[in-house]
A protein has these predicted regions:
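Surface-exposed amphipathic alpha-helical segments
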Residues: 44-47, 140-170
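Bacterial signal peptide processing site
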Residues: 23-25
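Post-signal peptide N-terminal segment of mature Sec-exported envelope proteins
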Residues: 29-57
Length: 170
């Protein structure tokens, strides 16, 4: 199994944890506009939109390999859970899971939880950075996953992606 297959498997796992995106979402001038009312700026340098997933937005890069997603949950019980628990849920499915770092922070004026996790998926060592941001009406999930050997190559893009969050979700 190639690192790309590992990233695809982890991406599918993460996507399965989030709600379905809406068809009215669009991309204009490098910005993703979610039908749920928020926006994020797309990273450059080889990242492409993956269609057909359940997240509002899923991105993949072949070289170096990696995947990231953005999603918002605007109803249901998950809105009541503490941010650290929600961040942990984004990396369910990892075996030999180790939390390397976790921190409570602010993303564009909103409370957030960030966790860096290493583990094994389908026999391959991967790393993930999960960020959960609490908006006025929604929880925003961001996830970046890559083979551990390639993880640092996409981390700056992921952080810029998360920090670009704007708008007031419905």
């Amino acid at each position: 199994m190639s690192p790309r297959d590992v990233v695809a498997g982890v991406g599918a796992l993460a996507v399965g944890l989030v709600l379905a995106g809406c068809a009215a979402s669009r991309i204009e001038h490098g910005t993703f506009h979610s039908a749920k009312g928020y926006q994020v700026t797309l990273p450059g340098d080889g990242w492409r939109v993956e269609t057909g997933g359940d997240a509002d937005l899923a991105l993949r890069r072949d070289a170096p390999p990696g995947g990231m997603l953005a999603d918002a949950t605007c109803e249901g019980r998950s809105l009541q859970y503490p941010l650290p628990i929600l961040a942990r849920h984004l990396t369910f499915g990892f075996t030999d899971r180790t939390t390397v770092e976790s921190a409570t922070e602010i993303v564009n004026g909103r409370p957030a939880e960030r966790a860096l996790v290493r583990g094994t998926v389908d026999g391959r060592e991967v790393s993930a950075e999960a960020v959960v941001v609490k908006g006025a009406r929604c929880i925003h999930d961001f996830l970046y996953v890559a083979p551990s050997s390639d993880f640092d190559a996409g981390r700056r893009d992921f952080r810029a992606f998360v920090e670009s969050l704007s708008g007031d979700s419905r």
